[in-house]
Amino acid sequence: MPKRQDISKILVIGSGPIVIGQAAEFDYSGTQAALSLKEEGYHVILVNSNPATIMTDAEIADKVYIEPLSIDFIERILRKERPDAILPTLGGQTGLNMAKDLSEAGILDELNIELLGTKLSAIEEAEDREEFKALMERLNEPIPESIIATTLEESLNFADTHGYPVIVRPAYTLGGTGGGIAQTHEELSEITANGLELSPVTQVLIERSIAGYKEIEFEVMRDANDNALVVASMENFDPVGIHTGDSIVTAPVQTLSDREVQMMRDAALKIIRALKIEGGVNIQMALDPDSYKYYIIEVNPRVSRSSALASKATGYPIAKMAAKIAVGLTLDEIINPVTGTTKAEFEPALDYVVFKIPRWPFDKFSTADRRLGTQMKATGEVMAIGRNMEEAMLKAVRSLEIGAIGLDDITYKDLSDDELLAALMPARDDRLFMIADLLRRGVSIETIHDKTLINEFFLDKVLHVIEIEQDLASHVGDIDQLQYAKKNGFADETIAKIWGKTAADIRTLRKDKKIKPVYKMVDTVAAEFESATPYYYATYEQENESIISTKKSVLVLGSGPIRIGQGVEFDYATVHAVKAIQRAGYEAIIMNSNPETVSTDFSISDKLYFEPLTLEDVLNVIDLENPVGVVVQFGGQTAINLAQPLLDNGVNILGTSVEDLNRAEDREAFDQVIKELALPQPVGKTATTVDCALAAAQSIGYPVLIRPSYVLGGRAMEIVSSDDELQDYMQRAVKVSNDHPVLIDSYLVGQEAEVDVLSDGETAVIPGIMEHIERAGVHSGDSMSVYPPQYLSQKVQDEMVQASINLAKAMNTIGLMNVQFVIHENTAYVIEVNPRASRTVPFISKVTHLPLAQLATRVMLGEKLSEMGFETGLVPNDDMVHVKAPIFSFTKLPDVDSLLGPEMKSTGEVMGSDINLSKALYKAFIASNIKVPRYGNVLFTVADDDKEEALELAKRFNDLGFALFATAGTGAYLSDNDLPVEVLDKISESDNNAVAALRQQKVQVVINTTQADDRAESDGRLIRNAAIENAVPLFTALDTVSAFLEVLESRSFTVKEMH
C-alpha cells in the first residue's frame, strides 16, 4: 500500500518536560518520527513545551512551536496551521491524553483533522480500564480478576471478597502514578483515594495481585494490511510487582521455553490485531513460573520507554517505522535502515544479551523511600550489551555512575545474614548488590529465591560473578583467570582490587598478553545478512567488526543516564557537537550508555559505541579508533571527570585545557583568578576538617552556603545558620566530596543571574543574560529564568558582561563556559564558573537562534569566532520574552521534601514565550501544569523572617478577590495588618486544619516558607505533601509567588467603588 497522498500537513505532539515516568525516550521517538515523515515528503509541524529537546530544533520539522501542551494552546496552533492529521502516539502519555481531549472537545471533528496511527477507539480500549477488560474477555485472553472502581467503597468491597494483597492501577496516568500494592484495608483506602484523585477520568482498576509471576514484555508492530511482527521480547529480572520502569530488564527473554515464548507471542499479535493499531504497541504479560498460565497486565497503544529500549537493544527503529506505517506504508514496503537490504517485516534476531538497569535519584534524595513498587521512581536508565549475561550485567552496573564498578563495591558489613535477607523485601533499588553480598556470604540461591521470587536462572548468573571474584582471589596473576574474568564483564579496576594492584597495572598486563576487546555490530539479523550499521559493543572474543575509517575522527563523550542535575540538556549538546564535527569533515564517534536518548540513535553519528563511560572503556575505544581528539565539554560532570585521567593516558582533550578545567573547580586556584581580575565575590574559605569548617564559618559569619567541590546539580549543598547545623552537615556530606575539600561561602541575599559564554581564547561572545526569578539560595536548575532580563539595571548587566569576558580570557576558555552571579546591593558578585556546556545551553540556543554547542565545537576544532562573523560582547536581545521554568516529580517521590533550596530537585523544564513577561510567565506556569485560578482561596504559612514580604503578596491576592487562609502565626500577623483571614488550627489540634482544607479542595494555592533551621518541622512538611498529593499549586519561594501574581493581575480587571 503506497503512502497516503490525501494528506500533506501533519502535526506531531511531543511529550513535554522530563518527569519520572516520561523521559528522554520521547525526544528520541519524536525526533525519529518527524524526520521520518519529512523523508516521505510531508509538511511536519511539531509542538512541544520542552526546549531541551532535539525535536524542537528548527531542522527537525518544517515548523516548530514551543508552547504549553494544553488544549487551549494546541487548539490555537490547529486553527492557525490547519493540519490534515495529528500523530499523537509518539508523545508518550501526554500526546495520547491530548488526542483524547481534543477529540472529546469536538475540535478534531470541527477542523476535519484525523488521528494517524492509532484510532481513538483503540486508545480508549487500551487505556480505559473497563473497555480493556471487556476486550480481553472478548478475545478470551486472561487478565487478573479485577473491578473498575470509581469510589473508595467499591475498592474495599473487592478486597473483602478476594482478599489481600491487591494492586491499584489508575486509568490514563503515567509511570504508575497514583498506583500501588495494598496489603491492608488502610493502605487500600489511601492508595485508592490518591489514585482516583490523579486519574483524569476518576477511575482505578483494583485487581488481585499476581506479584511473583514472571513479567514479560513484547514490542509489537502492525500495519494497515494486518502484517504484524514482534520486534523484541524482554524479560524483567524482577517478578511482577515492580513497575517495569523500575525493573532490571533483559533482552531477549532468558528463562522461557520455546513453547512459552510462542504462546505469549501469539497472544501479543492477537491483541494488536484486535485493537487495529497501525504502528507500535507495548504489551506487558505475567507468566506463572510453575505452569503455562499467563495473564495480560497492560497494553500501551503508543511508543513507550520500553520501545526506546527495544529499538536500541535490537537496532530496529520502532518510532521511525511507526511514523511510516501511520501514513499508509506497509512493513513489506519499508526498507530496514539497519541492513539497507532487508524489509522491515523481518523480526530482529539477537546474538547477544542486553541488560538494562534503572537509574534512581536516591543519591540526591537521602530521605526518599527506596522501596520499589507499582509506582515508578527512576529518573533514567542504562543499557549494556554483552555476549553473555554476566558481561552485560557488569557493564550495566559500571554505567550507572553510582560509585560501583563491580558487584563487590557496595557491601552490607553492618547487617547480619538474616537482617540482609529481611531487607531484600520489599525490593529496593540496590537489591542486585544485596543479592551479590548474600551469595558471597554463602546464602543459597534457593533461600534468596524463596524470599524474592526472582528466577533461579538470574540468581545463578549473579552467583557466577561471585565465583569468578573468588577464583581471581585464589589465582592472583593467573592469565587464564584474567581472560575468563574479562569475557564475563569484569572491569580492570575490579580485578586490580582483588589482586592488590592498580587498574593501570591490569591494563598494561592485558595489553602485554594481547587480551583486548573486539567490537561487534548490532545489526538486527544476528549476522545472517550483510549489514552496515555503525553501532557497536565491546566483548572479549576474536573477530573485530568495527572497521577503522581513513578519515580523521573525533570522539564525543555522552552524559550517561538521566539523573537530577544531569538531564537531557547534555544529550542535546552532544548531538549538536556531532553535527558540527561531521560538517567540519571529520568522522564523528559517540560513546554513551543511555538507551533513551537521541545521541544513541545509530543514524546520528558516523559510529556509535554503546559502552559504559569509564576510563577503561573509553581508552579501549581510543586504542582502536585513535581519534584526533576527545570532546568532554558536552557530557556533563560524567565527561569532565574523565578529562584528567584521559590526559594522563596521553589523550588529546579538545577545547579548554584540562589544566584550566581544573582551575575552575579548584577553589584556591579559582580565587586567585578572581583576585587578579578584581571581581566582586562572596567571602569564601576552604575546609578539609570539621574544626577547620567551623572556624571558617565563624569568621565569615552565618548564614553560609556550604558544598563539596566537583559537584553537579548542587548535590550535598546547603545553607547553614549555626555551628550545630554545620557539624551535622559535615558528618553527612564530607563523605561525598571525593577527597576534595568543602567550600564555605558567605550567603548573600539577592537575585541570581547567569550567562553562557562562547569563547575561542580571543573573542568572547555572550548570547544573552538569564535573570532568575528566585533569589540566591534556590539552585539555578530549580529557578525560573527569564531572557532577556527584565529587572536588572544596566550597570549590573554591564558588570556581568565584562566579568564574563574577562573570566573567559583568564581561564583560556575554548568552547563554552557558564558564569553564575548573585546581585547584591546593585553589584554583580561571581558565585560559580562551570568550564563546560551547562543545562541552559538548549534554552539560550533556542531563544537567541544561535546553535551554541555547534559553534563551540567548531571553535574546538580550530575555527575562529571572528571568521564566523562574531565579535566580543553581548549579542543584541530578542524582542520576545522567554521564561524557562523547572518541572518537579514530587508525586512520584512522596518522601522527598518539596521545599526548594540549594540542592537541585527538578527533573525537567518547560519554556513560555510571548511579547511581554506576564504572558510568557502565564505560558510557563500552564506548561508546568500549575493551574492559574481566576479566584479561590490562598493558604499562607510562612516563616517569621518572611512575614513582612508575605503581607504585600497577601494584599495583592486580596485585591484580586481571593480569600485568605493562614496557619496561626501567619494568620495573626495578616489580621493585625487589617487583612481578612481565616485562621486554621494546628494539624494535631482539630479537623479544621490546612491538610484537611487541601483534601477537601478548599484551597487553590499554597504558599509555604520555613526558617533555615526548621526544615523538618512537622506541620509545614505535611502541608507541602498534601498540596502535592492534591495537585494544588505549591510555592516555597516568595519570588515565584510574586511572578504568579503578576500573571493573575495581568489576566484580571480591577473593580473599584467610585463613591
Curated annotation (Swiss-Prot):
Which EC class does it fall in? ligase
Instruction: Quote the record's binding site residues for ATP 2.
Output: 707, 746, 748, 752, 777-780, 820, 832
Q: What is its EC number?
A: 6.3.4.16, 6.3.5.5
Q: Which residues bind Mn(2+) 3?
A: 820, 832
Q: MGS-like domain location, by residue?
A: 930-1059
Q: Where does Mg(2+) 4 bind?
A: 832, 834
Pfam families in the record, alphabetically?
CPSase_L_D2, CPSase_L_D3, MGS
Give all cystine bridges in this chain: none
Q: Which reaction does it catalyse?
A: hydrogencarbonate + L-glutamine + 2 ATP + H2O = carbamoyl phosphate + L-glutamate + 2 ADP + phosphate + 2 H(+)
Q: Where is this region: Carbamoyl phosphate synthetic domain?
A: 547-929
Explain how, and how many, cofactor molecules are bound: Binds 4 Mg(2+) or Mn(2+) ions per subunit.
Which amino acid positions bind Mg(2+) 1, per UniProt? Answer: 284, 298
Tell me the residue numbers annotated for binding Mn(2+) 4: 832, 834
SMART domains associated with the record: CPSase_L_D3 (SM01096), MGS (SM00851)
One BP term from GO: 'de novo' UMP biosynthetic process
Q: Name one GO cellular component term.
A: cytoplasm
The UniProt annotation puts the region (Carboxyphosphate synthetic domain) at 1-401
Question: Looking at the keywords, is DNA-binding present?
Answer: no
Classification via InterPro entries: ATP-grasp, ATP_grasp_subdomain_1, CarbamoylP_synth_lsu, CarbamoylP_synth_lsu_oligo, CarbamoylP_synth_lsu_oligo_sf, CbamoylP_synth_lsu-like_ATP-bd, CbamoylP_synth_lsu_CPSase_dom, MGS-like_dom
Record-annotated residues binding Mn(2+) 1? 284, 298
This entry's Gene Ontology molecular function terms read: ATP binding; carbamoyl-phosphate synthase (ammonia) activity; carbamoyl-phosphate synthase (glutamine-hydrolyzing) activity; metal ion binding
Required co-factors: Mg(2+); Mn(2+)
Assembly and binders: Composed of two chains; the small (or glutamine) chain promotes the hydrolysis of glutamine to ammonia, which is used by the large (or ammonia) chain to synthesize carbamoyl phosphate. Tetramer of heterodimers (alpha,beta)4.
Record's comment describing the protein's domains: The large subunit is composed of 2 ATP-grasp domains that are involved in binding the 2 ATP molecules needed for carbamoyl phosphate synthesis. The N-terminal ATP-grasp domain (referred to as the carboxyphosphate synthetic component) catalyzes the ATP-dependent phosphorylation of hydrogencarbonate to carboxyphosphate and the subsequent nucleophilic attack by ammonia to form a carbamate intermediate.
Give the protein's function: Large subunit of the glutamine-dependent carbamoyl phosphate synthetase (CPSase). CPSase catalyzes the formation of carbamoyl phosphate from the ammonia moiety of glutamine, carbonate, and phosphate donated by ATP, constituting the first step of 2 biosynthetic pathways, one leading to arginine and/or urea and the other to pyrimidine nucleotides.
Q: What name has this protein been given in UniProt? A: Carbamoyl phosphate synthase large chain
Q: Give the organism, scientific name.
A: Leuconostoc mesenteroides subsp. mesenteroides (strain ATCC 8293 / DSM 20343 / BCRC 11652 / CCM 1803 / JCM 6124 / NCDO 523 / NBRC 100496 / NCIMB 8023 / NCTC 12954 / NRRL B-1118 / 37Y)
